[in-house]
Amino acid sequence: FGDYFPKKFGMSQTTRDKILKTTFLLLLEKGYDRVLVSDIQDRLGISRGLMYRYFKGKSELFFEACRKYFYDKFFPELDYDKITLAEFFRNAEKAVGSMTNIDGEEVDILKYNTLYSAMIQCEPKFKREAQAEFDKARKVIRNAIKRGEIKKLPENFIGATILAIFGRTSYITQTPSNSYVCKRILEDIDQFYRLIRRK
């Protein structure tokens, strides 16, 4: 299907991957509730029939695109039973750097997090996926408390604080640069770990 796509996408990606990437970038650009299937078709220059060879409908397409770019692409398989909270944070910090650049296209981290929130609110299947991922993080927190890596604080408090740091969607006073937001996220998670770590 190479002739269906502009050369900027390169030939190394599969047709399905191109559709997922374009869908995700459009969701970031326009917002969850403003992207139409026709927008994706127009951006790629493909027929609706070709898209439906890969996805049953719009909901499945959005789910698959978001699962890939929120989880599969940035979080490798980790042993959540053995990993320390410090190691978990290091993996998350690497992911923040990767998330802000998708194949050469800069991604606004605040829009990225806003889309994540919208998907959780509007797509039950994605909400279940997010809950499963959060349960893995809670396991890491629970084990970190048991092992004495961090102070004995409520799991929910630690988890909610981590989500608040990584998942910020706006700044009250002004919208800072993308690099500043990423820098603050990494600094804040480091400071938080220092606060909860047992001496």
Regions found by a protein language model. Give the residues of each.
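Amphipathic alpha-helical segments used for helix-helix packing
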Residues: 100-124
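Generic hydrophobic, amphipathic alpha-helix propensity
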Residues: 15-23, 40, 65-69, 73, ...
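Amphipathic alpha-helical packing segments from all-alpha helical-bundle domains
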Residues: 78-79, 121-149, 160, 190
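Helix-turn-helix
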Residues: 18, 26-60, 64
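Hydrophobic alpha-helical connector segments
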Residues: 64, 77-106, 158-162
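C-terminal peripheral helix-coil segments that are non-catalytic and often amphipathic
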Residues: 1-4, 90, 94-98, 135-147, ...
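Hydrophobic alpha-helical segments that form the core
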Residues: 151-172, 184-191
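N-terminal intrinsically disordered/low-complexity leader segments
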Residues: 1-13
